[in-house]
Structure formats: structure tokens, C-alpha cells
Amino acid sequence: MLLTMEDVEHVARLARLRLSPDELEHMRDQLSKILDHFQMLQQIDVSAVPPTAQVTDLINVMREDEVRPSLPREQALANAPEQQDGMFRVRAIFEEAS
């Protein structure tokens, strides 16, 4: 499935990536190949496979929590489209009660 350049530009915009024309072409090729693989996977007959299957016998294997330094504020906000007073600025989604 060959994606259009507009498709790739749209995905890049959603991911907030600035890609050069060469990078856009490379991503178009890569993403098209990935979608081709998904199309092949969709053709596999899985009717005999139970809807939920655990193949590793692992149950909730999690690492111990450990305190580590956090990301510096400047780095965290570097790609934010809008920021205010050192915080992410997002559009309000709730209406205020009257």
C-alpha cells in the first residue's frame, strides 16, 4: 500500500515532527512497507486461536520502583506547541459551571 506524501506529512504533523523532503520520502517508503505487512497479517486465519492466549506463562513481571532524576523542564517543554509559566498549555475541554 503506497501512501501519499500528504498522508506522511499528516502523520508527521500529528507527531509534531519536522521532516525534510528526503526524510518524508524515506518515511513514506517505510510506512508503506509496514502497512503492507499488516495487510498480510490480516489474511492469516486465526479462527482456531482462542481470543485470549498467554504464550509466555509470565504473570505481571514488573521491575522494582526506583527513584531517578526526572527530565529537565526545558527538555520536557522543548516540543510543546504552547507553554505558559513553565507548563504545557492545552485547550480547555471542560466548560465552567455557571
UniProtKB/Swiss-Prot annotation:
One of its GO terms (molecular function) is asparaginyl-tRNA synthase (glutamine-hydrolyzing) activity. Its EC number is 6.3.5.-. Signal peptide: none annotated. It catalyses: L-glutamyl-tRNA(Gln) + L-glutamine + ATP + H2O = L-glutaminyl-tRNA(Gln) + L-glutamate + ADP + phosphate + H(+); L-aspartyl-tRNA(Asn) + L-glutamine + ATP + H2O = L-asparaginyl-tRNA(Asn) + L-glutamate + ADP + phosphate + 2 H(+). Gene3D superfamilies: Glu-tRNAGln amidotransferase C subunit, N-terminal domain (1.10.20.60). It holds the Pfam family GatC. GO terms for biological process: glutaminyl-tRNAGln biosynthesis via transamidation; regulation of translational fidelity; translation. It is an enzyme of class 6 (ligase). Keywords: ATP-binding, Ligase, Nucleotide-binding, Protein biosynthesis. Heterotrimer of A, B and C subunits. Allows the formation of correctly charged Asn-tRNA(Asn) or Gln-tRNA(Gln) through the transamidation of misacylated Asp-tRNA(Asn) or Glu-tRNA(Gln) in organisms which lack either or both of asparaginyl-tRNA or glutaminyl-tRNA synthetases. The reaction takes place in the presence of glutamine and ATP through an activated phospho-Asp-tRNA(Asn) or phospho-Glu-tRNA(Gln). NCBIfam families: gatC. Belongs to the GatC family. This is Aspartyl/glutamyl-tRNA(Asn/Gln) amidotransferase subunit C. It comes from Roseiflexus castenholzii (strain DSM 13941 / HLO8). The lineage of its organism: Bacteria, Bacillati, Chloroflexota, Chloroflexia, Chloroflexales.
